[in-house]
Amino acid sequence: MADDELETYRLWRIRKTVLQMVHDRGYLVAQEELDQPLETFKETFGDRPSEKKPARSDLTILVAHNDDPADQMFVFFPEDTKIGIKTIKAICQQMQEQNISRAIIVVQTGMTPSAKQSIGDMAPKYMLEHFLEAELMVNITEHELVPEHVVMTAEEKAELLARYKLKDSQLPRIQQCDPVARYFGLRRGQVVKIIRPSETAGRYITYRLVV
């Protein structure tokens, strides 16, 4: 069925972008997962989404951070076209049972206002992020117009501010809702190094504070 073929392709692309995203945040993802071709995805999960092969719940991802295996994160793909508060509660229940405090929710078309509100209410105990499927069809960091972004550690940030005798407030800013900031899961107060090619200097580096 043509619809199944298209939907299988979409789910493969979306899951691939999510795996790249959590890998770029420092979570452990096997190289064969990052490189998984469409055919392998079909063999693993199925190619008939209309018959729940795969069901979106089959695509759930659980990853641990390279620097701290106790820092784990879920990625959920709920079946509901629009996410309501009931789905958020079910997700938090699963996180509580497994003692995991971070998750990304991949949303098909949107969320109800009460679901969005509940995500805010859960923080900081449960840190939930959400992305629309349409946002994950491509990896924005691979776009030729998006320069390389490197997230700085707290130590690197402190060293930068000391070296240039700066305060946080003197750095240029990047909004937390910026697509690249969302991709990296940046939080307010973090600093990101942006590396652009330069015809004269080879490369041109700027720093931005997340606000």
From Swiss-Prot:
Note the superkingdom of the native organism.
Answer: Eukaryota
What InterPro entries does this protein's entry cite?
Arch_Rpo5/euc_Rpb5, RNA_pol_Rpb5_N, RNA_pol_Rpb5_N_sf, RNA_pol_subH/Rpb5_C, RNA_pol_subH/Rpb5_CS, RPB5-like_sf
Record-linked PROSITE patterns = RNA_POL_H_23KD
The protein's organism comes out as Caenorhabditis briggsae
Q: Which UniProt keywords apply?
A: DNA-directed RNA polymerase, Nucleus, Transcription
The gene is rpb-5
User: Which BP terms in the Gene Ontology apply to this protein?
Assistant: transcription by RNA polymerase II; transcription elongation by RNA polymerase I; tRNA transcription by RNA polymerase III
From the Swiss-Prot or TrEMBL record, give the protein name: DNA-directed RNA polymerases I, II, and III subunit RPABC1
Q: Which family does it belong to?
A: Belongs to the archaeal Rpo5/eukaryotic RPB5 RNA polymerase subunit family.
Q: Does the keyword Transcription apply?
A: yes
Reported function:
DNA-dependent RNA polymerase catalyzes the transcription of DNA into RNA using the four ribonucleoside triphosphates as substrates. Common component of RNA polymerases I, II and III which synthesize ribosomal RNA precursors, mRNA precursors and many functional non-coding RNAs, and small RNAs, such as 5S rRNA and tRNAs, respectively. Pol II is the central component of the basal RNA polymerase II transcription machinery. Pols are composed of mobile elements that move relative to each other.
- How would you summarize the oligomeric state and partners of this protein? Component of the RNA polymerase I (Pol I), RNA polymerase II (Pol II) and RNA polymerase III (Pol III) complexes consisting of at least 13, 12 and 17 subunits, respectively. In RNA Pol II, this subunit is present in 2-fold molar excess over the other subunits.
Query: Where located?
Result: Nucleus
Cellular component annotations (GO), alphabetically ordered: RNA polymerase I complex; RNA polymerase II, core complex; RNA polymerase III complex
One GO MF annotation is: DNA-directed RNA polymerase activity
What main location does UniProt list? Answer: nucleus
